[in-house]
Amino acid sequence: MKRAVLPISTFSLMFLLSAATAQNSSPTGGGAQNAINGINSYPGPEFVKYEPEREALDRRIDLFLNDWQGSMPRHEHGSLVLRDILTRGDNFAPSEKGAVLHYGNFLAYGRLSPWNSTLPSRLERQQEVFYILGGQGEITAGSDTAALRKDIAVFMPANLEFVMRSTSAEPLVMYVINEPTPADFHPKTKMAVKDESAGHQRTPAGGDPYVVPGASGHWGHIVRELFSPADGLATEQSVITVTLNPLTMGEPHPHRPGQEEIWAAIDGDSLAFLGTEIRIQRPGMAYMLPPDASTIHSNINASNRPAKFLYFAKFPDGDNWRHGAPAATR
């Protein structure tokens, strides 16, 4: 059954923002200014700039948020059933819901039935990341075999034959990220397997009074690293998880053209703050912020348990975008 995407009054958001500002009344400092890859922070909330008037078509934000339950099933690698969430389209004006990707090929929800296996397959001119959401299984590529369970991530390079198997009475379910490879790209010859719980946890990039304990930036983002170009990514530049502890939120901020950043919910319900709208985001839902340098976004965890996201992104070429910082006060 397709889930309803519920608009929420901005009153609750304003309450949360006011509370966050009251609790973080430290004096403004130089702080970390690097605005890429989720490790930055504005020097202070005063640097978030809002449009002077409400965008007449701002409810178009619903085109940038999608749920796999609204998609028709298709098959990949034989018996792996995919339900698309985000697909190729336009970063700014998608022709249909979820058709927002310019660089990546797709983000889908995958399901392998109990005790089933895929056909021996090779990815041609494309690569995939499998992030396991539930079930038990194993994957074999070349001479390597790895066990699959919740929060195991697998990077499968192009041209490497592999087989995935479900080894329990529960379906093996996952997010599937698919990226293209350029013509002159030389893929890795082995798959990479990461246990998310053992991934490197980032620390703050600079002295920011607004970052909560344990987070690495954007106020409340707890980041664990999965895959980067060093692991073999061709188009995407970062695959990580981001966790928000109970009653915390990310720093509202925009993205500039060329930044394709995806947030797919893994655990917990949260609030996606997009432009001037709020939507409930549940596991199985993902969004991309329009990278127009003015529409802001944040993820808000108003619950009593952690909320975790799978994040992947392509950044503008040569990106070192910086926000201006106020002069230090004496």
Predicted regions and their residues:
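Bacterial N-terminal signal peptides that target proteins for export
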Residues: M1-S9
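Bacterial N-terminal signal peptides
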Residues: I8-S18
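A short, N-terminal "cap"/entry segment at the start of jelly-roll beta-barrel domains
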Residues: N24-Y103, D184-S238, N320-R330
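Conserved short histidine dyad/triad with adjacent acidic residue
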Residues: T87-E96, A108-L123, I240-R256
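Glycine- and acidic-residue-biased ligand/ion/polar-headgroup-sensing regions
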Residues: R125-E138, G258-L271, G275
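Short acidic-glycine-tyrosine-enriched beta hairpin
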Residues: S143-A158, T276-D292
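Ligand-binding loop in jelly-roll beta-barrel domains
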Residues: A158-D184, R282-M285, P291-G318
